């Protein structure tokens, strides 16, 4: 019953946070395949978003090993999506392969912190035996 409740909570949260139109992106297609970093910022030039993108480029192999994808939504019209960021200029979410929110913050955290969180998860522990780098 707890998983059903978690699923309902996630769907409710996502309905509030994520725009109805995701440019054809349906998060269900990534369930059990990928972990997802979702970011929301006022615009594409937000300093935290830029820092995250730089850090992601520097850690490409680690991102691939953890099956991480990044989707960003902004209110500046560059993505064509309208989002609600709860009056915060930046929000980051980590969604696990099971579709549950594993981490949420209104401040940027280092990818190393997210990697450590991911690496502590049982599913990731199994995957680590087959890392590609």
Give the residues covered by each predicted segment.
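Non-catalytic interaction/Regulatory regions outside core domains
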Residues: 2-8, 13-133
């Amino acid at each position: 019953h707890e998983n059903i409740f978690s699923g309902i909570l996630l769907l409710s949260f996502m309905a509030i946070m994520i725009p109805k139109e995701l440019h054809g992106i349906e998060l269900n297609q990534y369930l059990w395949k990928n972990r997802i970093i979702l970011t929301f910022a006022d615009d594409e030039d937000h300093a935290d978003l830029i820092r995250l993108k730089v850090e992601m480029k520097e850690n490409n192999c680690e991102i691939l090993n953890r099956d991480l994808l990044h989707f960003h939504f902004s209110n500046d019209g560059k993505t064509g999506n309208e989002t609600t960021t709860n009056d915060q200029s930046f929000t980051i979410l980590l969604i696990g392969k099971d579709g549950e929110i594993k981490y949420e913050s209104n401040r940027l955290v280092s990818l190393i912190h997210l990697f450590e969180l991911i690496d502590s998860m049982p599913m990731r522990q199994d995957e680590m035996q087959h890392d590609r780098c």
